[in-house]
Amino acid sequence: GGAGLRAAIEAAPHMKLAVITKLYPTRSHTGAAQGGMSAALANVEEDNWNWHSFDTVKGSDYLADQPAVDILCKEAIDSVVELEHWGLPFSRLENGKIAQRRFGGHTVKEGEAPAFRACYAADRTGHMILQTLYQKCVSMGVTFFDEFQVLDIKIDDGVCKGVVAYEIATGDIHVFEARAVTFATGGFGKIYKVSSNAHSLTGDGPGILYQKGIPLEDMEFYQFHPCLLYTSPSPRDDCP
């Protein structure tokens, strides 16, 4: 998905790497994100990353790692511009700048009024992010192993040395040896009865790491996106 592709772009200039993906990269659930990505560009009205950070921490009920939130909100501005330079076709204002719209929870001046902060590409922002990142990876010569499902990690003397993967098309098992491994496997929404997550989000990555005793953090905070309403099992709820 988006996180794995972006990690590959960051690492590619410094090392030989490969992306192992259960799906074709542009079929990731990142493509389900429609509304936009928030960054305090101030293209429509006054804005700054401090207000963005305030809204994010408040939206987390003050449970978020606040220094990490500051980094996220501050660097979001350059990240959006970077995606634009890589070719992401953002929607535009009449003056040619990246369009921004209101989105839930975002305000100016720490709650004074709603903020125009979400940068978007019509109603397919996530899809265009995936396409842009994948094209950037291809242009950088990143190697892809599409439709390979990771089954386990290879650990020698407490050090991760690679992964074991199943080639879906042939049923063959492969061992990939590496000096460093990054997991960016997305969520696990399909363990829940009601979820809008893609059927591929089965928690493979977190499950593998948990079985190896690798600590996982903040696992109780899980978001379904797009959101859903949980209805009662009454037959009348199925009526139009």
List where the protein language model places each region:
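N-terminal Rossmann-like FAD-binding beta1-loop-alpha1 element of flavoenzymes
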Residues: 1-18
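Residue-level detector of alpha-helix initiation sites
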Residues: 1-3, 24, 124, 188-189
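Glycine-rich FAD pyrophosphate-binding loop
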Residues: 13-32
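A short alpha-helix-loop-beta-strand transition element characteristic
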Residues: 30, 63-69, 80-100, 215-218
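Glycine-rich active-site loop/strand segments that organize a redox cofactor
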Residues: 39-71
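Conserved redox-cofactor binding core of oxidoreductases
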Residues: 84-172, 177, 184, 228-229
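Glycine-rich loop(s) and the adjacent beta-strand/alpha-helix scaffold that form part
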Residues: 180-232
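Single conserved hydrophobic/aromatic residue that forms the stacking wall/gate
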Residues: 230-240
